[in-house]
Amino acid sequence: MSTPDNRSVNFFSLFCRGQHYSKTWPLEKRLAPVFVENRVIKMTRYAIRFMPPIAVFTLCWQIALGGQLGPAVATALFALSLPMQGLWWLGKRSVTPLPPAILNWFYEVRGKLQESGQVLAPVEGKPDYQALADTLKRAFKQLDKTFLDDL
């Protein structure tokens, strides 16, 4: 995945963008066959919730049983890195430009929103997945589900 040249994205801002993208993306079942975001967001949320306690449990278990500290720390760090990997991936995905097939569909959905009387801000530059997430979220609130039939 490549990032657009007009946006400066540093390593740590990708985590914030990933968090925002996961909150913006509509978790609709009809989008799951086309976009992998549904699975990644669900697994990232699961990892954010359960991996820190698993890391603490792993450390305590190894120390209580007299195990070596090195493998326990490595296992705990791996468990703690899983949510970060998900957020990083979502952040990278959010700034990735849309491929041509999805770009056409993006403009069709925007057109349907404008036809229904919604006021939309003009698209600046090449649209990315974050713009798609914002548009889809608004479309699911404002339009009926038939706009997905063209997907």
Swiss-Prot record:
InterPro entries cross-referenced by the UniProt entry: UPF0208
Membrane-traversing stretches: 46-65, 69-91
Regions of this protein lying in the Periplasmic compartment: 66-68
Source superkingdom: Bacteria
Residue ranges that the UniProt entry lists as topological domain Cytoplasmic: 1-45, 92-151
UniProt keyword terms in alphabetical order: Cell inner membrane, Cell membrane, Membrane, Transmembrane, Transmembrane helix
Topology with respect to the bilayer: Multi-pass membrane protein
Annotated Gene Ontology cellular component terms: plasma membrane
UniProt cross-references to Pfam families, sorted A to Z: DUF412
Record's subcellular location: Cell inner membrane
Family listed: Belongs to the UPF0208 family.
Record protein name field: UPF0208 membrane protein YfbV
Organism, as annotated: Escherichia coli O6:H1 (strain CFT073 / ATCC 700928 / UPEC)
